[in-house]
Amino acid sequence: MENKMFCYQCEQTAGCTGCTGNSGVCGKSANTARLQDELTGALIGLARAAEGNEHLVTEEMNQLVLEGLFTTITNVSFNDETLKLLINKIEDTKKKLVPNCFTCSGSCGKNNNFDMNTLWTTDEDVRSLKSLILFGIRGMAAYAYHASVLGYTDETISKFFYKALFAIGTKDWGMDELLPIVLEVGEVNLRCMELLDKANTTTYGTPVPTRVPLTIEKGPFIVITGHDLKDLQLLLEQTKDKGINIYTHGEMLPAHAYPKLKKYSHLKGNFGTAWQNQQKEFDNIPGAILYTTNCLMPVKPSYADRVFTTEVVSYPEIVHIGEEKDFTPVIERALALGGYTKERHMTGINGGAQVTTGFSHGTVLSVADQVIEAVKNGDIKHFFLVGGCDGARVGRNYYTEFVKQSPADSIILTLACGKYRFNDLDLGTIGGLPRIMDMGQCNDAYSAIKVAIALAEAFKCDVNELPLSMVLSWYEQKAVCILLTLLYLGIKNIHLGPTLPAFISPNVLNFLVENYGISPISTPEEDLKKLLNN
């Protein structure tokens, strides 16, 4: 290819077509992008080697696949050396599956890595469907990885990653062969989200509605960001009785609602807003910052000496906490920095001083009778699921205005970091229920699905017949696998924004419009009018 790189997997991709220059909009270099492609091609080679050798596949190999896919998600790794190490590990693993191939002079292709340039330059519809599969399994790998950290794995899920990778590397497949696999990504991701939900709730308890302050107390503190609850638990244990407060950031906010994490008195509150504001919010911060997963942005000099990474997150010259999970360097840095000398009163983007989280399916379904009665009485006339990823693109204030303008007899269900656009608003209550219910992290889309299905069963109708509208925002690959799950479930008339994915070709988009009624967002006023009149 003439391009120095090609990447169009995130919502902010250059020109809504693809990043092709010296670096991507996310900040990764062209060399990093090429190494991510090489890593993906090596994973496809591993899937080829596993074909027919399934009996030789081990849990260690499965974990390597998850790690490799997770690493290529937007804003996870900017470290070329880490990518090279993973590529080498995959090559060594292939030798265990097909040792004879490495001494064979033939060219059967059994262990060949895949050249991703052939994907980026192929027929646009094939490229589009294979991209949906690839980006979908990247997102799903993150969920499977988090579940595995808590000791939960599923053979069906593990096997599907190989199947999907193999499909991406198959040359002669067209739309007829690829479309079913696209929807299968959604099917398996539903199973994966269910597994992660089970892992989280079994380990930490069923989330309960919890008010979380946005004020930072004086004294030493650590900000933990990302999604990994196990890392948070370990950090809380290691900081007990050390005079250090812990604050969540971004997608870690829902951790406050889990009973076995709430018990730690030094888990104090939430720092700041969504991921795209971190460079401003972390500027000269007098505390340490621990990244457990995405979203990591290029680190600025004003806080680089207090940033730490762990798990698959990696950034050049930043201290990485390895598998031993000894957070001593993070703790020592927090103590040395000392924190703020007096309380710092932070707010949400609308000026609110606190937010509420913890409305998982376990909580919402426990008051299902109350919800159903409110609908029957006419107190609740509509449900909106307004959630997904946040991002920096101008126009995402659409979601703030949509929620502000939603009628007083409607409930807003939300999840993922898109909620930061409005989660500090006070919209009051309906029949004792808050109008805004934060269901959790992006993987807690499973909670929204469970609630929707339960409501449909209660009213003896199809989910699409409920007074329920989905207005979603997307940014990275976890949003892709969630969207595919909704399509697998047959959920229609989803409004998606702020832009449609660059990797959706006109023909594939036409298929989605004709079969599922997907449409781009327009204005809050127009969309509310349309959705409320359906």
Give each language-model segment a name.
Residues 2-32, 36-37, 41-45, 51, ...:
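Anaerobic metallocofactor- and corrinoid-dependent redox/one-carbon enzyme cores
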Residues 44-203, 209:
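Electropositive, gly/pro-rich neighborhoods at or near active sites that engage anionic ligands
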